[in-house]
């Protein structure tokens, strides 16, 4: 898998484009896509997260998730709702030659992004936060790291 780690501060330009940090782009698998250089995928999947961030997935990672989602039943109300919520919150975007992705107004508004962002590498995905919202989340959970780590590790 890609193994994204660390964080980078960037800004969305006036056209709503976000530069994917070079160190994250270096983790992308090689591609021959005409819209990207040799080490950049032609596309990423962007999903609105329930915590008001945006999640970025490489196509192979999203396709694995999509197989799980597709296995859900259209005849079970909760499973059908989950499918609807997942796909309603998803867009596929293409990287340009400079390694930027366009973010729609709907997605920028969801995350509260006007300009500055923090991009966090989270193993198989990248998480895009508006800096103020990220600070609120981190400050609100400052004493919980040890408890969470103890519970899950």
UniProtKB/Swiss-Prot annotation:
Source taxon at top rank: Bacteria
Chief subcellular location: cytoplasm
Gene Ontology biological-process entries: negative regulation of DNA-templated transcription initiation
Gene3D superfamilies noted in UniProt: Transcriptional regulator MraZ domain
Cited Pfam families: MraZ
GO cellular component, one term: nucleoid
Keywords linked to the UniProt accession: Cytoplasm, DNA-binding, Repeat, Transcription, Transcription regulation
GO MF term list: DNA-binding transcription factor activity; transcription cis-regulatory region binding
Location(s) in or outside the cell: Cytoplasm, Nucleoid
SpoVT-AbrB domain location: 7-61, 90-133
SUPFAM superfamilies found in the cross-reference section: AbrB/MazE/MraZ-like (SSF89447)
PANTHER family: TRANSCRIPTIONAL REGULATOR MRAZ (PTHR34701:SF1)
Subunit: Forms oligomers.
Annotated family: Belongs to the MraZ family.
Matches recorded under HAMAP family: MraZ
Name listed for the protein in its UniProt record: Transcriptional regulator MraZ
Native organism: Chlorobium luteolum (strain DSM 273 / BCRC 81028 / 2530)
